Amino acid sequence: MKILLVRPPRVKQAVTLGEFMFCEPIGLEMVYAVLMDRHEIKILDMMIENTLEKELETFKPHVVGITSLCIDVNMVKSIACKVKEINSGIIVIAGGTQAFLNLSSFYDINIDHVFKYTTRDNLNLLFDALESKKELHLIDGIHSKVNQYRSTNVFGRNEYIIPNRLSTQKYRQHYSYLGYKPCAIMQTSLGCSSNCDFCLRWRIEGAKENDIDLECVMNQIKDIQEDSIMFYDNNFLNNRDRLEKFCDLIEQNNIVKNFICYGSVKSIISHPETIKRLGKCGLKAVLVGYETFSEKELADYKKKSTVEDNYKASKILKEAKIDCWASFMLHPDWDTKDFKNFRSFVKKLKPEITTFCPLTPFPNLPMYQKYKDRLLLRIEDYEMWSFSKVSIKPSKISLSRYYFEILKFILFVNLRLNSASYMINRFGFMTLIRITKGSIKILPLYIKLMLEVRKS
Ligand code: SF4
């Protein structure tokens, strides 16, 4: 069969980090790897080229598979609609994060099958059935229109599949992670045992770590053509012994790459010597979720770290000469004094890069119930659920004042914390220009949000 795998274009009105962190569609690369031997298959990344109609006309796929993030629902449905308009015989499949979290959002006249989770087995079973045109029985993880979207109800999660990165060869020079461009991504471990209250990732991947064999990891690293790799494990720094073995293998194989990873404060402070060694083995930056200056909020979020731990982690990274790309969460109960305390806290931590998002109670999270009465978004306003919009009504200041405080914080980060000089020193002037273009787009979005609230 001919299969076209599609990543939808960016949702324009969403405020996301996409301008700074633009990763390969690795889920589609995994599907490609499973199906490539028996089918003719290609990937269309609509974030780079918006050529769906041309592909439908020239490639003439029998199946179009569309991946999704939480904010993509309407975009996926509109792609499905366009596909069926052009050729109603094309089979349309939806999958991705949103399908796992909110399956029924894809129950749509133009979508034939929805993958709640993807495994080698369910991919092969479905495509065998589609090819043979035999009656479609229920398959684990797949909800088909012909079966009224029923499935076997067997619980499952996405299987770890080694992606075929050649499938995105023509796009790869575009993928970047902040100043590292081109940059590949890979996963060396699934799940997370930290179980933070606000986090979707461990709920999607599992409540404890499932580490991939390091030989398999090393083989992938050797195969990756890019000089920079972002490990998108939930907490790459979790296991000291595994990290030491990782460093051994990097040294034995003379691998010289730039690595970026997510790492928890708890892991950084529990094995500082290993963190230093990782720095010598190529670890350039760690994305750390410090979240807040408030001890109470850290406890409420069920973070396993304290404010003091945050300072310790920051010091360890600086001593190891590893950049810290910090992320924070803005609590809806903050007032202007809290924002001021927050700015002082960030100034003391002095991360090289600072990102933030307002606390977002996604419908699948327990905290959704807690904030249900203060929600500013409806569940079906899918595009609005981007991490940067205020979704909970602030309790102590007005919404427009809250947006004003966010704007003040953005200016504080850019003008006072010298992010610009870090960018130039680390990545050069052209990267600063590229990133600044993204920031410039974000600033008016917040100004617009603030003014909209004032008018209403
Ligand atoms: S450490 Fe990170 S990935 Fe793990 S549960 Fe907490 S926020 Fe989620």
Residue ranges of predicted features:
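Non-catalytic positions within long, well-ordered alpha-helices that form the structural scaffold/packing
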Residues: 57, 106-107, 222, 279, ...
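Conserved C-terminal portion of the radical SAM core fold
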Residues: 38, 63, 91-93, 225-232, ...
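Radical SAM [4Fe-4S] cluster-binding motif and immediate context
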Residues: 164-325, 332, 344
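Glycine-rich beta-alpha loop elements in corrinoid/cobalamin-binding modules
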Residues: 32-155, 357-364
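N-terminal [4Fe-4S]-dependent radical SAM core
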Residues: 9-12, 139, 143-188
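Short acidic active-site motifs
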Residues: 51-53, 102-103, 270-274, 312, ...
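Glycine- and acidic-residue-enriched helix-capping/strand-helix junction motifs
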Residues: 12-28
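Radical SAM enzyme core and accessory elements
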Residues: 2-5, 40, 53, 62, ...
